[in-house]
């Protein structure tokens, strides 16, 4: 079977490019089969883009050759790392009749154990890096996202992703990268491009402008390698779980969490999850108890959540963060300070400590019991903050599916409706109370559950992560989700709250509105210089 390309003779340049790629890569790495092409055209929300075919280079040199040829044949290229960009567009290109460049074969890993850095290719997943560190550098820790363990480390960093625990905002801990421009030109940032440089892979900036920022959420080149900071595995890891019963408590609680971040007592991110979000992680919609055409009633949601008997997490918002300590004395002192300042701001608070030996054991067998953790959803957070991959929040994508959650989850092929709205806001209780009611109102009006997450990624800023979750096979739900998304995004922008990450197949930077500077024209000039005769779409 062949792709739809066969039935579009006007796309002659794509045919010529296909033949060229077969010569360079070998026929087995130029994919035209219908089932693969169909998967590349499928996301967790409605899309219309079509794909010509897929190429799978196995080295930076092959990427370079494919890009130079794409420039010659004027073929648009859409790079993907591993394709687990669920909720933001999956593998679907920005425009139709693109050639998808799958970089999963570039899966090299190189660790500097002394300086705690790792250099990876775009095909390296969180799971692969975890296993490599566990076997070869057990003293090192890499922080994980809440997404699939099989998602790409580089892809997440380039698209403004963040992790749980230390080094939360990935991009802030990128030391250097290697990129190939559409012309085939080759770039190494920092000191990496200089011969015999002793701080190659160590220094964030070389001499002159730091060019690595040009490749974050951009189409100016394809990143084939990245060096990222790691952390030392802590001697002690403390987990703090807490919850509140009234939304009004968010005001003082978030301000106090911000103070704890600013003072340095909390180095990790803090997370506050709406009760709807927790319920969706541990169950599916109660079809026999509620009207499926409406948002699940809040009182019923809280009743069902409490029936799950999750210790501490039984409130309207349920929180977690971690403290990483070098000594037991440090751990005990920090615990006492945190309990003193937080206990009056929350309805429930619990903490416990695991030591390095326990973490090492969990790395090899994450099913081992931890006496202080009696529920799997709390155990999952412990593992994530300890840098141990689990399925994270992926099961919540099946909340509105009438079929059971499968053992192997593929959100695209299982027709899970899932759409992320990723908002940046000041880390303050006032802003939380401004945002939350608006999000809840829009979701309720459209019949979706407001699965809100407030995430304190640093001492100044919090991410407000809201997901539209539905079943795509239900007629009209794709359109309803899109309408809710667009209207809510517009309303939040009028309030001063913008998205920091966009679902690429139907959103663009232009959708954020008119700028008050000349960035658009400056970026256009950069693109005109670097993208002559070629077109790379935003890195996925």
Region roles according to the model:
Residues 211, 227-228, 238-249, 253-393:
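C-terminal cap/substrate-recognition region of VAO/PCMH-type FAD-linked oxidoreductases
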Residues 108-110, 122, 127-263:
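FAD-binding subdomain of flavoenzyme oxidoreductases
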Residues 58-60, 247-248, 323-332, 428, ...:
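Helix N-cap motif at beta-to-alpha junctions
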Residues 41-140, 151-164:
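Long, structured ligand/cofactor-binding scaffold of large enzymes
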Residues 5-9, 44-53, 75, 80-81, ...:
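Conserved glycine-rich FAD pyrophosphate-binding loop
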Residues 17, 69-70, 256-257, 331-345, ...:
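Short amphipathic alpha-helices in soluble, non-transmembrane regions
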């Amino acid at each position: 079977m062949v792709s739809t390309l066969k039935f579009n003779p006007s796309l002659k340049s794509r045919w010529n490019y296909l033949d060229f790629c077969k010569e360079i890569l070998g026929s087995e790495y130029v994919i035209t089969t219908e089932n693969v092409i169909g998967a590349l055209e499928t996301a967790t929300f409605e899309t219309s883009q079509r794909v010509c075919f897929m190429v799978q280079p196995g080295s930076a040199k092959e990427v370079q050759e494919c890009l130079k040829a794409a420039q010659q044949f004027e073929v648009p290229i859409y790079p993907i790392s591993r394709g687990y960009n669920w909720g933001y567009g999956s593998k679907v290109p920005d425009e139709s009749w693109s050639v998808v460049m799958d970089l999963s074969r570039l899966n090299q890993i190189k660790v500097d154990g002394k300086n705690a850095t790792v250099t990876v290719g775009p095909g390296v997943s969180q799971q692969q890096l975890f296993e490599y560190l566990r076997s070869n550098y057990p003293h090192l820790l890499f922080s994980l996202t809440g997404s699939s363990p099989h998602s790409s480390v580089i892809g997440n960093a380039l698209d403004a992703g963040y992790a749980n625990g230390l080094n939360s905002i990935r991009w802030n801990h990128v030391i250097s990268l290697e990129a190939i421009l559409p012309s085939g030109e080759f770039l190494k940032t920092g000191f990496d491009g200089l011969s015999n440089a002793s701080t190659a892979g160590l220094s964030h900036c070389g001499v002159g402008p730091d060019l690595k920022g040009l490749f974050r959420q951009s189409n100016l080149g394809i990143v084939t390698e990245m060096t990222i900071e790691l952390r030392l595995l802590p001697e002690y890891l403390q987990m703090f779980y807490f919850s509140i019963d009234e939304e009004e408590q968010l005001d003082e609680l978030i301000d106090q969490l911000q103070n704890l971040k600013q003072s340095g007592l909390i180095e990790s991110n803090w997370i506050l999850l709406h009760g709807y979000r927790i319920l969706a992680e541990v169950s599916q919609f109660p079809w026999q108890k509620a009207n499926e055409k409406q948002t699940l009633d809040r009182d019923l949601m809280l009743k069902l959540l409490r029936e799950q008997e999750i210790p501490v997490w039984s409130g309207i918002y349920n929180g977690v963060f971690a403290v990483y300590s070098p000594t037991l004395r440090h751990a005990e002192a920090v615990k006492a300070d945190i309990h003193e300042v937080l206990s009056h701001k929350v309805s429930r608070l619990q903490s416990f400590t695991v030591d390095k030996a326990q973490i090492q054991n969990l790395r090899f067998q994450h099913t081992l019991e931890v006496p202080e953790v009696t529920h799997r959803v709390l155990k999952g957070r412990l593992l994530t903050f300890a840098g141990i991959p689990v399925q994270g929040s992926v099961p919540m994508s099946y909340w509105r599916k009438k079929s059971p959650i499968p053992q192997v989850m593929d959100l695209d092929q299982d027709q899970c409706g899932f759409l992320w709205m990723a908002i940046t806001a000041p880390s303050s209780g006032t802003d939380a109370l401004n945002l939350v009611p608006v999000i809840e109102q829009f979701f309720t009006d459209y019949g979706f559950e407001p699965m809100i997450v407030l995430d304190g990624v640093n001492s100044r800023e919090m991410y407000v992560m809201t997901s539209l979750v539905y079943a795509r096979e239900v007629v009209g739900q794709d359109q309803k989700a899109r309408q809710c998304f667009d209207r809510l995004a517009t309303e939040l922008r009028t309030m001063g709250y913008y998205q920091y990450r966009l679902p690429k197949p139907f959103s663009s930077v232009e959708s954020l509105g008119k700028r008050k500077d000349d960035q658009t024209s400056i970026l256009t000039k950069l693109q005109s210089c670097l993208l002559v005769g070629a077109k790379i779409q935003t890195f996925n």
